[in-house]
Every structure is written in C-alpha cells, then in structure tokens.
Amino acid sequence: SNTINKVDLAKKEGARVLTGGKQSDQFEKGYFYEPTVFDQVTPNMEIIMEEAFSPVIPVHRIKSLDEAIAMSNSTRYGLGCTIFTRDIERALTGADNIQIGTFCINSPLMENMAAPFGGMKQSGIGREHGIEALEEFREAKHIFIDYDHSNKEWWFGNNGE
C-alpha cells in the first residue's frame, strides 16, 4: 500500500521510527496501520515533502521561525500545519507568512464548521464551511433602481431625450 511504501522509504532515507511503523497484527482483515511517528526527518525526505493521508507523522526540529516558514513554503502543498509555542505573536507571524489553508496554534485540527477549510497550492482549490464556501455558489448581480424618474441631464442631454 501507499502507506507501507512511504514508511519503508522514510526508513531507508534515515528517518527513525519512534512508534508504529508497521501494519497491526491484531487484525486479520483490513489494512489497519499503526499510528507512526518519525524523528530525524530532513526537509528533503519524501515523508515530509509529500502528503501522506495516513496515520503517519514526520517530526522535524527547526532552529528558527524563519527556517520553519522557508521550509513550509518550499513544498508544493499547503493544506494545514500546527505550531506549538507560548509566544502567540511569533505564532501569528508564522500564520501570516506560511502559505497554508489552515494554521493551528497549540492544537492540531481544531474544527469549526463556521470557519473556512481548504488548502493552498496543490492541496486543493476552494473552501468548505463558512461564508467562503457559500461564495462558491453565489453569482453576483448589480441591480440599480431609480425611484426618482426625473430626467438626468448628464445622461439624456439638455432636452431630456
């Protein structure tokens, strides 16, 4: 499966499995894969550059906010990210500068059905939820009504024609 291939490649590239990393042997049927956390991940590894859509998470330690912004923006995807910090001002600087659809601070995947959800770059077009999603179905039309009915010289000329 795609998950098995991604995990195997990450191991070959030098990422270290902290937990998981294999299919569960507790289920005879199905494709249940153990939640997997990787450490010692570098920015050029596929496990961090490609969307996994599986219970696999790479952990990459960074030294500065600038490094995090540059690394995040270097990928072709932009669905969501989470930052854990006590410095909300720095977190908001990251939110302003990272090209991402959903930016979570101190909590992954906080869901709010009134808030727009969707990615940037190759992680999707458009938004679900919120007024932004409704805008996808709206077609604007301008309607102007002149209740005055008087001649407008600027439009009809001096004779009202």
Give the positions of each predicted feature.
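Short alpha-helical functional segments enriched in proximate histidine and acidic residues
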Residues: 6-9, 13, 71, 75
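Conserved C-terminal structural/oligomerization subdomain of aldehyde/semialdehyde dehydrogenase
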Residues: 23-25, 32-161
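Conserved strand-to-helix beginnings and helix N-cap segments that scaffold or border functional pockets
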Residues: 1-4, 31
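Short secondary-structure junctions
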Residues: 12-23
